[in-house]
Amino acid sequence: MSLPMNSLYSLTWGDYGTSLVSAIQLLRCHGDLVDCTLAAGGRSFPAHKIVLCAASPFLLDLLKNTPCKHPVVMLAGVNANDLEALLEFVYRGEVSVDHAQLPSLLQAAQCLNIQGLAPQTVTKDDYTTHSIQLQHMIPQHHDQDQLIATIATAPQQTVHAQVVEDIHHQGQILQATTQTNAAGQQQTIVTTDAAKHDQAVIQAFLPARKRKPRVKKMSPTAPKISKVEGMDTIMGTPTSSHGSGSVQQVLGENGAEGQLLSSTPIIKSEGQKVETIVTMDPNNMIPVTSANAATGEITPAQGATGSSGGNTSGVLSTPKAKRAKHPPGTEKPRSRSQSEQPATCPICYAVIRQSRNLRRHLELRHFAKPGVKKEKKTTSGKKSSSGSSGSGSGALSSSGSVPQVQTVQSLHTLQGVQVKKDPDAQQQQQQQQQQQQQQQQAMTVSGATGGQVQQQVQQVQQQVQQQQQQQQQQQQQLQHHQIIDSSGNITTATTSAQAAAAAQQQAAGQQQQLVAQSDGSESGAPLSIAQVQTLQGHQIIGNLNQVNMTDFQQQQPQQQQQQQQQQQQQQQQQQQTQQTL
């Protein structure tokens, strides 16, 4: 018997269902070809889109509108253990759970509309209700009536899906919100981002833990607003620099036990930056002040019932540039800049009320520059005064042996001018006096032989050269002091060190002449050297003023007496040495 040519052969895979289920389970265990991730309770579970869509119409509508290759579905309000059990049920068709976990598992299955676990399935056509059989899930030691009663008392839920575009990530964020009638609110958020890793996205969208509401610290002078039971409060915050505001409405629920909702808008504009943070506490409502960066003002938020006086708009105006006046007792805390804060002087440790005055304090108290004073004390402690204004001599002289200060008259008369003498000139004068005494001692010693005379002449020459070098240094170091009298004239005052040096040179020249003449014809060459040296002294003396000559003549007798005494002492010493020899 032959078969027809158009007959079809039926090939049957005996264990098709078992083999396919086992193959899908292996792919899931090894993580191969997974194209989506479910996350809940801080854990993530890789899965396959085709399996999830076949098991849940809700996930089918959610994932087919997602162009992302590997979306990450965040399930808020679903326990991680329940999600793991649901995936086990989807991939294997059965799951074993504890009796305590069964209500939460069935509630999660109802939220996700998992086929085979949802007790009721609502269609869009005729809204008919289909019952499902749960006998295969109920163990023998559980009561069937009790389980069905538990499922019946669970709140009915309605699922809504919404698609939101995200421009920054160039993708789509699918947001699904599950609302309940009496048990509160539950949210299921689906996010897609191909650029980020799955784990990073999971950590970013983990469900937030319950924390205490943050209340920004305020100054003790800031006003506080307490909550009034059964009252609806309307808060207004500025949204732009033109004064237009957005109204934040806080609604009360269930009478006195209302739930306060707050928002934290951040508004940025070109002219100024305003940041408003409002935090409400059911027991003590303390609004956080809004800081204006442009004007530097701090504006505390106030309720409409206390500040608007019956105005239902709920918009609070923000001052722009000027500070608004407030009645006494309600002043706003002023923001103090760094320059207005107190500072401490690092030298005297004085407290300055404003830090901008610290520099002025240092300049006046610690680093003040000495100005021109009218009167200055001399080193001897005595003040030298000028003569009478009618005489107009203007010559000042001290009581010392050497003239210390010499003034040059100006065209106008000086009134009450006093000059401080130069300490450097005094030291130079003392050195010159010592050198002069040594010269006198060397010149008074007369030797019997010509060799001693030549040695004396050489010593005198060396001393004269030293004096010339000192005079050059003195001329470089001399300073001219400017003196301003009462009439506004400026005169110059010079020290009399130059006059004293010239007088000393003259005395040295005279002494050299005496020594050369006392030597006689035996020392002809030294005589000519002494004469040449005295010529320089005569030239310097000829350039001196008459005042210097008078001062020198007054001092000359004293110097001669000193020289005679020194000569006598030297002669006595020579006689003693000769006697000893």
From Swiss-Prot:
Low complexity bias: start-end ranges: 381-401
Domain notes: The N-terminal BTB domain mediates protein oligomerization. The C-terminal glutamine-rich region is required for transcriptional activation activity.
Modification(s) after translation: The N-terminus is blocked.
GO biological process, one term: sex-chromosome dosage compensation
Annotated InterPro entries: BTB/POZ_dom (IPR000210), Dros_DevTransReg (IPR051095), SKP1/BTB/POZ_sf (IPR011333), Znf_C2H2_type (IPR013087), Znf_GAGA-bd_fac (IPR015318)
Tissues showing expression: Expressed in the central nervous system throughout development.
Superkingdom of origin: Eukaryota
GO cellular component, one term: protein-containing complex
Organism of this sequence: Drosophila melanogaster
Function: Transcriptional activator that functions by regulating chromatin structure. Overcomes the repressive effects of chromatin by promoting the open chromatin conformation in promoter gene regions, thereby allowing access to other transcription factors. Binds to DNA Polycomb response elements (PREs) at the bithorax complex and to the proximal region of the engrailed promoter, and positively regulates transcription of many genes including homeotic ones.
Annotated BTB domain residues: 34-99
Protein name: Transcription activator GAGA
Quaternary data: Interacts with Bin1, lolal, corto, ttk and ph-p. Interacts with FACT subunits Ssrp and dre4/SPT16. Interacts with E(bx). Upon ecdysone stimulation, interacts with Nup98.
Keyword Oxidoreductase: no
Species classification: Eukaryota, Metazoa, Ecdysozoa, Arthropoda, Hexapoda
GO molecular function: chromatin binding; core promoter sequence-specific DNA binding; DNA binding; DNA-binding transcription activator activity; DNA-binding transcription activator activity, RNA polymerase II-specific; DNA-binding transcription factor activity; DNA-binding transcription factor activity, RNA polymerase II-specific; identical protein binding
Alphabetical list of Pfam families matching this protein: BTB, GAGA
Span list, region Interaction with E(bx): 201-397
Main subcellular location: nucleus
